């Protein structure tokens, strides 16, 4: 412990690592002859997390086991255990196959691209983004809605490989071992049952264009984008070893699956189920290739996505966990924002339940949680920077429902001061 000056200053405690005083930090933890502040503890945790992440990637000759991959996914994604297992096994097998393909073998191992099917806000994109964090391979995400056939206004399919090449710093060898996630894949379904009616440049045409790069071909990729720089030299990228993960909400697919599985009996023996009796995620579990064909995917495209993983609807309990449990949980993010004003933000358990129910009513899944919290905390975040002495803000169920204002607890008072007992 260092001391400066006379009077009260000699009793001031300082962090032994960064030198900040006890008045400059939120917490100062004492040990035998040393002190450490909360900021240094958080910095140490970040260092440890980075080391754990690198040790995961380098384990078992560079191939993380499926359980190790799934364990890291658990830190960020709540639920969806089946989808996490499918992704973990597929990624593990993908790189195991690459590491052993140079060895002599009579059996050639083909790659297994993945199709993720799940309702809006169930975690498809988050699973792919989390994989990018934990794997030391080039990774890129593409939006299928922006893709068109070559020669039409929009992005060429080859632009996906260009983005992967950019993620690999134009290292062709690394890019050829990368992962591509194509989102909104359901939006390129065939627009008509009769393919000869009109030229479908953003639907079936894109599916046809994706076939070759997903199966494996040598793509000629212009470094600066082909349409604006037609005279440049092309880079040759072999897509045989690139793993493709496609995801989509497939709105309406549940009706096709239900119609296929519906009993054809009539009269008193017929079983009549209301649509709301079965949740979308439960119906998706029974998806078959024929259902995807009826939805508008062409047979060749379905054949190149042999692994299908379905995601469940998120119930109230799962949404509450999403709000609080992941490392980057929304509640933790807003609490961190309030900490910057030296204010503690507290959510009552009933308030979290009310937020979850609102998201379910809006049918936005986990994606809608942030907008709900933003609307709840808007007035508070607007007022707080100009208020003095506020120590804690408490959010109750009534606040979420719009019948009350947040509770403000002041440092110089033992009771809770409320801006207004109820909103007008």
UniProtKB/Swiss-Prot annotation:
Q: Where does ATP bind?
A: 119-126
**Annotated ranges, domain ClpX-type ZB:** 3-56
Name the GO terms of the biological process aspect: cell division; proteolysis involved in protein catabolic process
InterPro entries in alphabetical order: AAA+_ATPase (IPR003593), ATP-dep_Clp_protease_ClpX (IPR050052), ATPase_AAA_core (IPR003959), Clp_ATPase_C (IPR019489), Clp_protease_ATP-bd_su_ClpX (IPR004487), ClpX_bact (IPR046425), P-loop_NTPase (IPR027417), Znf_CppX_C4 (IPR010603)
What's a single GO MF annotation on this record? ATP hydrolysis activity
Q: Does the keyword Nucleotide-binding apply?
A: yes
Where does the chain bind Zn(2+)? 15, 18, 37, 40
Keyword list, A-Z: ATP-binding, Chaperone, Metal-binding, Nucleotide-binding, Zinc
GO cellular component: a single term: HslUV protease complex
Top-rank taxon, per record = Bacteria
| Family recorded in the similarity comment | Belongs to the ClpX chaperone family.
> According to its UniProt entry, what is the function of this protein?
ATP-dependent specificity component of the Clp protease. It directs the protease to specific substrates. Can perform chaperone functions in the absence of ClpP.
How is the quaternary structure described?
Answer: Component of the ClpX-ClpP complex. Forms a hexameric ring that, in the presence of ATP, binds to fourteen ClpP subunits assembled into a disk-like structure with a central cavity, resembling the structure of eukaryotic proteasomes.
Q: Which NCBIfam families match?
A: clpX, PRK05342.1
Please give the name of this protein. Answer: ATP-dependent Clp protease ATP-binding subunit ClpX
UniProt source species = Bradyrhizobium sp. (strain ORS 278)
The encoding gene: clpX
């Amino acid at each position: 412990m260092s001391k400066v000056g006379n009077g009260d200053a000699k009793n001031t405690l300082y962090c032994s690592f960064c030198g900040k005083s006890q008045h400059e930090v939120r917490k100062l933890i004492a040990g035998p002859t040393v002190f450490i502040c909360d900021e240094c503890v958080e910095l140490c945790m970040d260092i440890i997390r980075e080391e754990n992440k690198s040790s995961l990637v380098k384990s078992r000759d560079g191939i993380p086991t499926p359980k190790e991959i799934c364990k890291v996914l658990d830190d960020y994604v709540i639920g969806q255990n089946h989808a996490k297992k499918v992704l973990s096994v597929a990624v593990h097998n993908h790189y195991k196959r690459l590491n052993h393909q140079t060895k002599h073998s009579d059996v050639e191992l083909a790659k297994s691209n993945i199709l993720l099917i799940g309702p809006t806000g169930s975690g498809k994109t988050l699973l792919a983004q989390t994989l990018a964090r934990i794997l030391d391979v080039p990774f890129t995400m593409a939006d299928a809605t922006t893709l068109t056939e070559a020669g039409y206004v929009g992005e060429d399919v080859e632009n996906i490989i260009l983005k992967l090449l950019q993620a690999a710093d134009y290292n062709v060898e690394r890019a050829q071992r990368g992962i591509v996630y194509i989102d909104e894949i359901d939006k390129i379904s065939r627009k008509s049952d009769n393919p000869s009616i009109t030229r479908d440049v953003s639907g079936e045409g894109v599916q046809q264009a994706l076939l070759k790069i997903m199966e494996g071909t040598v793509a000629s990729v212009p470094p600066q984008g082909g349409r604006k720089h037609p005279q440049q030299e092309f880079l040759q990228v072999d897509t045989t070893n690139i793993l493709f993960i496609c995801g989509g909400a497939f709105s309406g697919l549940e009706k096709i699956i239900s119609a296929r599985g519906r009993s054809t009996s009539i009269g008193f023996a017929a079983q009549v189920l209301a649509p709301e009796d079965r949740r979308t995620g439960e119906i998706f579990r029974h998806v078959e290739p024929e259902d995807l064909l009826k939805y508008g995917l062409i047979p060749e495209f379905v054949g190149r996505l042999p692994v299908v993983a379905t995601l469940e609807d998120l119930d109230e309990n799962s949404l509450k966990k999403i709000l609080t449990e992941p490392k980057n949980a929304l509640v933790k993010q807003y609490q961190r924002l309030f900490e910057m004003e030296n204010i503690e933000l507290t959510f009552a358990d009933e308030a979290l339940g009310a937020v979850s129910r609102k998201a379910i009513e809006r049918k936005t899944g986990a994606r809608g949680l942030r907008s709900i919290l933003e609307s709840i905390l808007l007035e508070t975040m607007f007022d707080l920077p100009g208020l003095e002495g506020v120590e804690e803000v408490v959010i109750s169920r009534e606040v979420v429902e719009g019948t009350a204002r947040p509770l403000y607890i002041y440092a110089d008072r033992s009771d809770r001061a409320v801006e207004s007992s109820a909103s007008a």
